[in-house]
């Protein structure tokens, strides 16, 4: 069990009954809501990311995780494991490290990975990410193995053994078991506990927390590696194959937006369910435009 502090933006019209229903569905009984400030404190064993997604969907409001646990927590923003320090690193996700009574609760979301592959999560002996895996060093402790889905995404919540204070300042690495070139990594930094985070502007970027939240959310909900602008056809995995009838194209972005529920499957599932218009023809995927189906690949 652990406590997590959330902040809901523009909370004036948030219905408390809506929150209560979501917490009932998640089997969470201990929570406190301050309608004046938008502060929400939740105690339970459900991953913070899962709670956040449920509440954002239910309230249609942006929500921040402001702090977790009364003990020292940690967080690692996952970047591309790139040896070229002159490039601006891409963000691949985030992993939270939340101490419980006896273990450490991991709350991980990683995107843009190779689809349907096994990945290992580990802490390395170094905290140097300047040259990617080369500077991170060998493994200090292996935390878990997990498989990416067809979209190249891993969502994981898991308790592991270890001492978080001994990991602070080290690298957290998520790397593919059978492809050493596919890896993402970040430094494990201290994060705020309950009531400790009052900042509105990030000192590192100068952006508001809500701006950074929107950017990170777009990464977490992003599509798989088949939508990367700089991906070559040879780099595009099975999610972009003709057999999968994917909407992803090496030349054009996916016709299936986040609102249109992903790529067309072999069962010809509609990508435009909200409009009740199928994006899929019998031969090739298509996209919906102005109420008409137009081929996009």
Swiss-Prot record:
Residues given in the record as Cu cation binding sites: 11
Q: Which UniProt keywords apply?
A: Chaperone, Copper, Cytoplasm, Metal-binding
What job does the chain carry out?
Copper chaperone for superoxide dismutase 1 (sod1). Binds copper ions and delivers them specifically to sod1. Also has a role in cell protection against copper ion toxicity during conditions of copper excess. The C-terminal region is thought to act specifically in this sequestration role.
UniProt family annotation = Belongs to the CCS1 family.
> Where is the stretch described as Disordered?
222-263
Q: Where, per UniProt, does this protein localize?
A: Cytoplasm
Query: What is this protein's record name?
Result: Superoxide dismutase 1 copper chaperone
Could you name the domain of life of the organism this protein comes from?
A: Eukaryota
Per UniProt, the ranges with Low complexity bias are 234-257
| GO MF terms held by the record | copper chaperone activity; metal ion binding; superoxide dismutase copper chaperone activity
GO biological process: one example: cellular response to metal ion
Mind naming one GO cellular-component term on file for this protein? cytosol
- Principal subcellular localization: cytoplasm
Primary gene name:
ccs1
